[in-house]
Structures are given as structure tokens and as C-alpha cells.
């Protein structure tokens, strides 16, 4: 399922670069010491006048995060969050015994009416097989929602997520941006993260200028 990107990468996609010089506008000194091209960077939400792709670099420490930019021609490989929502892939992972991976496996046992994936530290660990997960690690989840989704189905998902063996948070990705599922189910509105900022909305599928 690894794809060479033919279209613009989306937030949370993991991308590999053809050289260290492909990372632009990085100021953090630790990146040069710890990051190498065998490790992916994660696409983040931002806009650039030069049509560069906004990315973030993860370090070995939780506080080590660096924002930068890359050009499309320097991306050589892409993995989407949905790649990891695969039971066989999860069962074969060296990290299969970790609670977030066990939690993800349990979610694959249900035929959900949408595409979903794994982001954050668990997605990064699955992609790199770097043992960064531990007993208290969270599971970050993403639901693709190009159209409004059935509320009852989302409540069923949230109920299943609440029973997982680790803390799990779900972001719902719409054409307008992304919002926290638990916030929207609880309040009827949520903070929508867009490439131009954040706005509070009850209609997260509607495109508006932030």
C-alpha cells in the first residue's frame, strides 16, 4: 500500500524525502543530529505561497517537534493513516503486544461504514518499527468524512473506542478541516482545524474562510 505521491499529500500522511537538504526552514538543531532520510516526516496543516508541503519532524523525545517545508519533487514515498487500519499488518508488527496496537486490532474487527486510520505516535511507530510505544501511549485515530456521517454510527464508534485498552482520540477529517469527534458529539459543535487556522463550528463539513 505504499504509494508514490501523485497528488498533494494530506495532513497526517507520512512522507519520505530524497535528501536531508529537502527539509526547508528547519531551525531546531536536534534535527540535523537525529533525523535521517530513512525516517518519515508527517504532513501538517498550513499553506505556503510557493506550494511547498508543510511537514513536521519527530524526535526521539516527546518535546522534540520541528516544523518545516518540503517540495513535492523531493517526496519519494508516502504512507496514509489508512494503511495501518489493516488487521494483518497490525498482527505482523513487532509492536503487536503494545496496548495501542492491540486497541487498533480490535477496531479492525468491526466493518465501519467509513475509511479510518492511525496517526500520531502509533502510526509513526508502525511505519518505522522504532519502539517508541509504551503502556501509557495513546492511540490517535482519523476518520475520513468527505460527506456528513451518521451520528448513531459515530456514537457506536465512540463507545467502542471508550472500551479500548488505552486512551484513544478520534479526529474526523472533512473537506473543510478536522475536528475532535468527542467534542462534536458532546457539544454539537467543535473546533475545526483548517490550513488557515481554527474556528468553532456546528457545521464542520461546510467550507468557510477561517
Indicate where each model-derived feature is located:
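Conserved catalytic core of two-metal-ion nucleotidyltransferases
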Residues: 162-194
